Amino acid sequence: MVSKDAMKLHSKQDFEERKIKIIKILSYLGLTYAVVGWLNEVLFHWSNSVLLSHYSEYIAIGIFGTYRVMVEKNPYTRKRIAVLTAMVVGFWGLLPYLFSLGEPALGYFSGKATWGRGLHTPMTLTFFLALLLVVLFGRRAVCSWNCPCVGTRDTMGDAFRQKSIKSEATWKLRHLKWLLTGVYFILFIAVLFPFSKTRIIVDNFSGMVGVIYFGSFLVIPITGNRNWCRWLCPYGGTFGILNKVGLYKIKADREKCISCEKCNKGCDMGIPVRDFVETKGQVNVVDCVGCGRCVTTCPVNALRFYDVRDRFRKIPPPEKGGLLDDEELDEKGVRIKAFIAEL
C-alpha cells in the first residue's frame, strides 16, 4: 500500500512536470510572438500597431524577464536578469519609442541612429562607448547586461537551457560566426562612404541578419537558448575580439578545483571551462559572454571575475555566488565534504 507521503511526493512531481511543460509552451509562444511582430513590420504589414512590430520582442522580454527575476534563486543571476530586462525594455525599447533621440554617427548613419539601437550600429557614439566598456569589463558589459539578443535567450529561452548541445563538434562550430562578423567589418568600412551602393550593403546586411536572428528563435527548443550567441552573432564576434585582448577574464584557483565539471554544465555557450582551468588557470576566450553561470555554480568558489577594477585592488576579493556562499571553507577537505553533501 502506497503511503500518504509517497502519494504527496508523486503528486508534487506531477505538478512540477506540468508546470515545466506549461512554461515551455508559454515561452515558445513568446518567441513566436516576437517573430510575428518582426515579420509584420518588415514583410507583411498586417497591422500598424506597435504591438506587432520589432517592439514585440521587447514586450515579451519585459513579461518573461519579470517572471525570471521572481523565480531565479541565485542572487547574482537574479540581479543580472533584472538589469538586463530593465535595460532592454528601457534603453532599447521605451527610450527610442518615446523620444526620437539622434546621436552622433559617421558616414551613412549620420542623423539616423538612435540611442539604444545605436549600440549595434557601427560608427555611432554608443557603439564606440560599447567597445570601450568591453575592453575594460569584458563582453559581459554588453552581452550579459544590455543586449536584447541575450534578453530573449535568458528570459523566454531559459526554459530550453537544458537542450543546449554541448560537444567537441559544436564547440568547433563557434567559428561560423566569423562569416557574419566578416560581413559586419565590411559594413563598418562601407558606412564611411555615404553613396547609393552603401545603402544596398547596409540594407542587405540588416535583412540577412534579421532573417537569421529571428529564425533562430524558432529552433531554440532543439538547439538550446544560446544558438545565436554561440554560432552566428556578428556583434558577439566583434566584441569577442576585444573580450580576448582586453582586461576581462575569469580567473581560477586550480588548488580549489575538484573537477566536478559543474562549470561545464552551467555554461550555455558550451565553453570547456574545466579544460581551461586545468591548462591555463583562467578562461579568456572570445566566446565568453560573462553570464557568470560557471562562477555561481562552482561549489568551491574556485572561479572569479577579473576586469579593470582589479588593476586597482591590492588583493582581488573572491566572487560570491557559488552553492556554498555562506560557509567558511578554509580547508580543502571541508570543501570536498560539503560538496559531496550537496550531491
Put a short name on every predicted segment.
Residues 288-292:
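Cysteine-rich micro-motifs
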